[in-house]
Amino acid sequence: MRGTRLALLALVLAACGELAPALRCYVCPEPTGVSDCVTIATCTTNETMCKTTLYSREIVYPFQGDSTVTKSCASKCKPSDVDGIGQTLPVSCCNTELCNVDGAPALNSLHCGALTLLPLLSLRL
């Protein structure tokens, strides 16, 4: 019985690896209008985050114009403090496929993590 559970765990982990190809993010290395940043790039294996930096925030309020952003794949990303009112260049980070279509506000959970927990719970390790 325990061997069956371990085999199931190995199968789930293998499936997660197969289902998780390289991350893809929207990229625009130069400040670009949000609606104009439509180039998609496949990230390298060590780039596990999509990063968005917001520029020209002051011209957006009161909704007179489009904000500009830079977007990229990133190996590290430190998001701005949510309460950081008045920050000059707010940064947002996310880690799912094409998640930086806008300014993604936070990290999303990994679906494979939940799949991995199910067999572990039944193993009672």
From Swiss-Prot:
Lipidation positions, renumbered (GPI-anchor amidated glycine): 103
Keyword Ribonucleoprotein: no
Keywords, ordered alphabetically: Cell membrane, Glycoprotein, GPI-anchor, Lipoprotein, Membrane, Signal
Propeptide regions on this chain: 104-125
Signal peptide (UniProt feature, chain positions): 1-22
Membrane association type: Lipid-anchor; GPI-anchor
Positions annotated as glycosylated: 46
Record-annotated UPAR/Ly6 domain positions: 25-100
Domain of life per record: Eukaryota
Subcellular location, record wording: Cell membrane
Keyword Cell membrane applies: yes
Any single Gene Ontology cellular-component annotation: extracellular region
Protein name as catalogued: Ly6/PLAUR domain-containing protein 2
Organism whose genome encodes this protein: Homo sapiens
Taxonomic placement: Eukaryota, Metazoa, Chordata, Craniata, Vertebrata
